[in-house]
Amino acid sequence: MTLTKWALPLFFLFFYLLPLDQRPLWSPDENRYAEISREMVSTGDWVVPHFLGLRYFEKPIAGYWFNSISQQLFGDTNFAVRFASAAATGLSALLIFWFALQLWQCRRKAFLASLIYLSLLIVYGIGTYSVLDAMVTLWLNAAMVSFYIIRKEGSLGSRIGGYLLFGLACGMGFLTKGFIALAVPVVVIVPYVIYQRRLLELVRFGPLAILSAVLLAAPWAIAVHLREPDYWHYFFWVEHIQRFAADNAQHKAPFWYYLPMGLLGTLPWLGLLPGALRKGWQERKISPETLYLLAWVILPLLFFSIAKGKLLTYILPCFAPLAMLMAANAVDLLKEGKERAFKVNAWLNGLFGLICLVVLAVLAFSPSHAVYGEEDQGALAVAMVIFAGWSLLGFIQLKEVSRRWTLSALCPMVLAIGLPWALPQSLIDSKLPERFIEANQAVLMKSGTLLANDVGLASSLAWGTQRSEINLFDSKGEVHYGLGYPDAAGRYVARADFPAWLEQARKNGQVALLMKTDRDGNTGPVPTADETIVSHRLTLLIYHGAQ
């Protein structure tokens, strides 16, 4: 791979931006964020987040702002929904390039750090997926980079400006995802400055960072409090304390959860990981920058491992410094003529592709584990081509590995290009209901009232029909809080109340109920519909209006 100034921009263009519009939105996350921002644009309310027309206090506002601006620029498209995440990832890669250049004065290390970062499986997956983690990671990366730069000796004015900038980055992180965005800088920087015996400097200048962060966040924080006095109570206690520390925390997982998931996320560069960490540990006492990067990787990982609530996206901030450590070690190994790590990495990619091919074969031909049905033969073929390509890209490096090792960056890109055409219909109906909704758009648009028995389905309906008032049937899900307000009365229909409610609703026109059923297609007890449309686990019940 030739090192040119166009390589990274072209890589980002072809493998990040161009595929964004090729696959439907995944439920529930992408539909949720798409719909929240669509409602923000349509209502003009840029202060209080709403979802399905209901108050939704799960996150602060900045991520929704960026998504809404994207929709204003690019329309109600899947590209627009994902653009903010992709753009944030690209800016993180640019920041990594600049920071690596400052640390090592080596363009090759800077280039490889950015390339490795962009092609990490976890970074690519989250960076082309509409969630807030790529955006908050950008602000955390900016905060961590700015702090390391200002820790160097400089004039009083430059230090003051640097700490103010550090605070602004932390403030944007807070406005994007809340208090948890402040945890990463704290758990890394405080131990680091104590180890470096520079705690007094942090005590002297740290309040400036706090001041700039508070001044940045205060206008919206005050505005949302004046509009919705319960916002901060719910956001702090439910979305932070209960999610991360309480016994009933969301997404509970064992302490070691991030170890296997993190290793998988480092593909296609897993073979470079042990050497990078080992060298970082060996150089921690003689290289301040290496110690800083190592702390940036390990301490947030430990923090999120201790928390009871865990999601893979939480550890995304650990991968910018990890990419830099791997790139620096790779360049040093090449200078020393050592190829073992690159050969191991090539073998790992080759074997990973082969293992995935075997798993696909089992899923395709085992009656008890079948995922691909008779109608999915084309999708199965594409999936096999994807992992055969991944394997081939690994094995062809073994000849002249010192020249070809960067081909590993293309492994996830084969997956990125082929994925939209490799999904079985059962998965599409379960996780990508957009296609089913598009196929039944006419009958849905004729319906005066729309219901769904799942919040993810409701958000898909809202996005697909451009209607926010989708009623919830039999399950309140993540909007239970918003449904508790008096002005949301009537937005939820219990199963026991459905027959009587339906009789009244049909007087105002056609009613459509979209349901996600169990694997046997059971809808449970509901009145017999005038029309029934079924596709795998999706069932659409149409009740004509009363004559």
From Swiss-Prot:
Name the UniProt record assigns to this protein: Undecaprenyl phosphate-alpha-4-amino-4-deoxy-L-arabinose arabinosyl transferase
Pfam families with a match to the protein in the record: PMT (PF02366)
Gene Ontology annotations for the cellular component aspect, listed alphabetically: plasma membrane
EC number in record: 2.4.2.43
Main location: membrane
InterPro entries in UniProt: ArnT_tfrase, Glyco_trans_39/83, LipidA_mod_glycosyltrf_83
Keywords (A to Z) from UniProt: Cell inner membrane, Cell membrane, Glycosyltransferase, Lipid A biosynthesis, Lipid biosynthesis, Lipid metabolism, Lipopolysaccharide biosynthesis, Membrane, Transferase, Transmembrane, Transmembrane helix
Keyword Transcription regulation: no
Pathway: Lipopolysaccharide metabolism; 4-amino-4-deoxy-beta-L-arabinose-lipid A biosynthesis
Highest rank taxon of the organism: Bacteria
HAMAP family attached to this UniProt entry: ArnT_transfer
